[in-house]
Structure formats: structure tokens, C-alpha cells
Amino acid sequence: FKALQIGSVWRADRPQRGRYRQFTQCDIDILGEPSNLAEIELITATTTTIGRLGFKNFEIRINERRILKAMAAYSGFEEKDYDSIFITLDKMDKIGLEGVAAELGEEGYAKESIDKYLELFELLKDRKDVAEGVAFLKDKLGDFLDQEVADSLTEIATAVNATKNAEFTLVFDPTLVRGMSYY
């Protein structure tokens, strides 16, 4: 099932400064496709549209939630805490590495786990290429990161880069976190 829609959306929470309760959003949804084709098609449709609007040299950031889970497990966090940890991680672009460390510490997580977790992000900050970042993590995390998961994200990046028809860079961003609860 594929759907494309443009329409009004309303925020359930109290809008922060610079945000509106109601805004217009474009949605592309694909349901029922078990392979990576849906991901590839969504990224391609998005980049094609942005390119046709005249934008050049833009960046598309991608991540894989299962990689985040592997990073958290490797660092010693319990699975029941992942959602809370990821909500804090999602603030990285606003509060920085130190802010994330402080907030995780305030939430009562072990300093050793926090340090080990955030060290991964520090080591990844200059590895923007998807294949390079994923390969680094696979090597570092070992069995915590399933080879199939690593191959899946690399396959998506390879296909998107091979078929791109706009001027953009596909970037691996392990701080990119959005779950269904966000929406």
C-alpha cells in the first residue's frame, strides 16, 4: 500500500517557540514492503522532489533504530531503558554531547555506560559516509550488531547513491532518533 498526502497537521503537545500548533506536512507512506525497496523509494522520492524544487548540495541523514539498540546494549544499558535513552539522545543537536551525558546521569544511568555510549558518537562524528560508519560500528560492536542490520543500511545507501538524480549527500547520523511515539 502506498499513499501520498499533503495537508494540515496539529501538534498534540504545547508548541515550543517558533513552532505552530497547526502546520502543513507532506507524507509519503509505504506499508507491506518487507525489503529495503520501500526505504530506497522514499529517500529517492524525497530527494528528487527537493532537487526539482531547485535545491542543491543538501544533506539527507539516515540511521537505523536497530543500530541504536546495538550501541546501547554494547554500552551496558538495559533494553527497558532504550526509549528513555533515545529521547535524550535526540536532543544531541541542541544540548551537545556534554548535555546528553549530564541528562543521562541525572536519570540515574551508570557513568561507565554513559561514557562508553557517548564515546561511540564521538568516534563516529567524522564518519559521515554510511558504509564507513556502519563498518566501523560493526567492527567495534561485534556481535551486538547483527550483520544483517549492518548490511541492510549499507544496501539502502548504495542503492540511493547509485540512482540519485539530485545533488545531495547521504549521511550516516547515529544521533537521528524518531520513533512512532514521536508522532
Regions found by a protein language model. Give the residues of each.
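Acidic, His- and aromatic-enriched active-site or binding-groove loops in soluble protein domains
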Residues: 77-102
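N-terminal entry module detector
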Residues: 47, 59-60, 72-81
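Acidic carboxylate-rich catalytic motifs and surrounding loops in phosphoryl-/glycosyl-chemistry enzymes
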Residues: 60-64, 173-174
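Short, well-ordered strand-loop elements centered on a beta-strand within folded domains, enriched
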Residues: 21-24, 59, 81-84
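Positively charged, Gly/Ser-enriched RNA/tRNA-binding surfaces
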Residues: 1-56, 100-183
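A general alpha-helix detector
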Residues: 45, 67-71, 84, 99
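Short, conserved secondary-structure transition motifs
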Residues: 62-75, 90-96
